[in-house]
Amino acid sequence: MQRIDHPLLAHSLGSQKTLSSFHFGVPGQRPKVYIQASLHAEELPGMLVAHHLRPLLEKAEAAGEIKGELVLVPVANPIGLAQRLDHKPMGRFDLDSGENFNRHYPDLAQTIGPAVLKLLGADAQSNVHTVRQALREHLAQSTPSTELQSLRHTLLTLAFDADSVLDLHCDCESVLHFYTDEACWPHLAPLAHYLKAETILLAKNSSSGSFDECLSDVWCHLAEALKTNGNSAPLPQGCCTTTVELRGELDVSHALAEADAQAIFNWLKHTGVIGGPTAPEVPPPLCQPTPLAGSETVKAPSPGLVVFAAQVGDHLKVGDLVAEVIDPIANQTHRVLAGVDGVLYARIRDRFINAGGELAKIAGATPFRTGQLLGA
């Protein structure tokens, strides 16, 4: 294992943060898998999973079982990790710019597309190499000018040439669930089943500008551009990415993290990144994928106290009671009902809400939303 420390641009005088990455196997060896945790810095289950995954990787490396390359970043956001306000962690948004740490990643296909599309030929693997080389050159020539930009640039530089990228997050209160691109799902389905995901949300493009989509969408967009231009050059999905939501913010325990780390390790063996004894058989799925465009965000019609009737993991029908929002001044209770059939896969932790605030999310099977599919 090799540890590499990446100093970020200093935000102010006398203050500089460092991102640390841990490298296993041989650089450049295929397949390459990149795993990071806690890009939203207050989302800590993934950080503990990375802590438990590391000794498994060290043991595999010592036994000569790592056949590819693995990069592990257990603390993907030292900027957000240092942010607190009134004793509360503030790791989702950069307090200086107001930007979400997992948004505003670039459209790399738009950047490299005009030049790289002309270079693609009849050999699929050669085309993958050409695209990765173009991405490498673009990132090498990019010069970030802020601390936040340098964090994004460093993460992309570590991950851009990976075959698979796992971005470990969590929700407020939730079951374990997945976000991934439709093109990536076949490759990542065994991982979801090893982890016993209870909701799987698929999208072709959520238009969110998230870290994982930045890395997978470049391949989808370039392939679409080839088709639009009538170019028959083959371009496989060179990078499959997923955001794994490891339950809720308070689900930080050794028992859960050890099980999740072992599940990820089993998937690494299943994909051939790690050799040695055969991986356990992929478990049967606990759910079927549903479209992200079919996910309902249940909102509060008025301000008040929140009393949930539905628990995370409940299978709801249209009209089922999700929560009551109580106004103790007006002595009114507003019943908030499910608008779609599906699993209530996430809900808020707070028990007071403002009018229009998000209460919960239900994974419906029928698409009904368009445009930007992820919130702030």
Regions from the PLM with identified roles:
Residues 1-376:
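Structured catalytic-domain cores with a bias toward divalent-metal coordination
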